From Swiss-Prot:
Locations listed in the record: Cytoplasm
Catalytic activity annotation: L-proline + NADP(+) = (S)-1-pyrroline-5-carboxylate + NADPH + 2 H(+); L-proline + NAD(+) = (S)-1-pyrroline-5-carboxylate + NADH + 2 H(+)
Protein name: Pyrroline-5-carboxylate reductase
Gene Ontology terms for molecular function: pyrroline-5-carboxylate reductase activity
Keyword NADP applies: yes
Family: Belongs to the pyrroline-5-carboxylate reductase family.
GO cellular component: cytoplasm
Pathway listed: Amino-acid biosynthesis; L-proline biosynthesis; L-proline from L-glutamate 5-semialdehyde: step 1/1
Known role: Catalyzes the reduction of 1-pyrroline-5-carboxylate (PCA) to L-proline.
Principal cellular location given in the protein's record: cytoplasm
InterPro entries: 6-PGluconate_DH-like_C_sf (IPR008927), NAD(P)-bd_dom_sf (IPR036291), P5C_Rdtase_cat_N (IPR028939), P5CR-like_CS (IPR053790), P5CR_dimer (IPR029036), Pyrroline-COOH_reductase (IPR000304)
HAMAP family: P5C_reductase
């Protein structure tokens, strides 16, 4: 039976735990560490997992160790547990869920030959609709990578990418939920400005975006084709799209994505 260690029981760590348990994994095979005893107790009561405060204890004989801590702590935690990982009877796989920390930096902080996987998650994994990308280190074999993908698939979709694409991936999936939250927020405000109650405007906007996303995913059609299907000649939608285009919406997304990728690259240098 696979044993999982989750170092850090924050939002991302809890989302992973929730997904694994929903996929019928035995909670007694999931160890979660927290600096806060209160938080650890909360997760134990909610999910029935094993709550620990010692990272090395959690990593002991774990098959997969997920590092769900802030980027600045990744190397520190890896250095802390590397001795335990060396002594495990079977080779453990370490999975970093933090932005900005390269595979090379992690491999240098651990003993030679440690399998390391770098993941770029996003927050919709909190509701089982995440988009996680995986990049394998040089010591990860096909079976180990497949195991990590299977575990991550419990909280959404998974895609393998090259590490050289991570900055672009950060702009496209890691940060993009925030773009959509902002667009939704703006549309809700527009609805209120038109005289709708805020609750009504929110319901209309959120349900419409959810439906549109489902159409793009399930029909396989290009977004431009789906947009054309809503845009009758000289109609209301065409009038709205014209305003958005004249306001420079495409350029705004180009610049936002570039700024995000640039910042991701900058963080990766430190």
């Amino acid at each position: 039976m696979t044993t999982i260690a989750v170092i850090g029981g924050g939002q991302i760590g809890e989302a992973l735990v929730s997904g694994l348990i929903a996929a019928n994994m035995n909670p007694q095979n999931i160890r979660v560490t927290n600096r806060s005893e209160e938080r650890g107790q909360e997760l134990r009561d909610r999910y029935g997992i094993l709550n620990m405060t010692d990272n090395s204890q959690a990593a002991d004989e774990a098959d997969v160790v997920f590092l769900c801590v802030k980027p600045k702590f990744i190397v520190e935690v890896l250095s802390e547990i590397t001795g335990t990982l060396d002594n495990n009877s079977a080779q453990s796989v370490v999975v970093s869920m933090a932005a900005g920390i390269s595979i090379a930096a992690m491999e240098e902080s651990a003993s030679a030959g440690l399998p390391v996987v770098r993941v770029m998650p996003n927050t919709p994994m909190l509701v089982g609709k995440g988009m996680s990308t995986v990049t394998k280190g040089r010591y990860v074999d096909a079976e180990q990578l497949e195991q990590v993908k299977d575990l991550l698939s419990t909280v959404g979709d998974v895609l393998e990418v090259a590490e050289s694409d991570i900055d672009a991936v950060t702009a496209m999936s890691g940060s993009s939920p925030a773009y959509l939250f902002l667009v939704t927020e703006a549309l809700i405000e527009a609805g209120v400005n038109l005289g709708l109650p805020r609750a009504t405007a929110k319901k209309l906007a959120v349900a419409s975006f959810e439906g549109a996303a489902t159409m793009m995913k399930e029909t396989g059609k290009e977004p431009s084709e789906l947009r054309a299907g809503v845009s009758s000649p000289a109609g209301t939608t065409v009038a709205a799209i014209r305003e958005l285009e004249e306001s420079g919406i495409r350029g705004a997304f180009y610049r936002a994505a570039q700024a995000c990728a640039d910042r991701s690259e900058e963080l990766g240098k430190h």
